[in-house]
Amino acid sequence: MLEADNVWFTLLTMNTNPIHFDAEYAAGTEWKKPLVDSTFTLALVTGLSVQDVSEHGVNLGWKEVRLPAPVFAGDTIRAETEVLAKRESQSRPGFGIVTVRTRGLNQRDEVVIEFERSIMLEL
């Protein structure tokens, strides 16, 4: 996770909270340094899971998003995904719905984000 990526994403999404890009401001907080924007963490960890879980699928939504630990510039993030449920689509013949839980972990194996995601895939 690079500092430049975090600042770029934060400003691109018009998030003006200085905790994400102002080191002097962040030094006065409990974290002492800028936090990576949580929506960037969500996007990154979702992206890390696409190749294994949903490369040819369509996202239907996220739920139960939790952020149990902060992410900082310099952290190395990886993703783990488990399938929670699968079923045939009731409205789209030939498609299935898969529900997964994905966790993002840092280099210390601390969970930094966890969420459930529903994906529609062609059968």
Which residues fall in each region the model found?
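Short, surface-exposed secondary-structure edge patches
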Residues: 32, 68-69
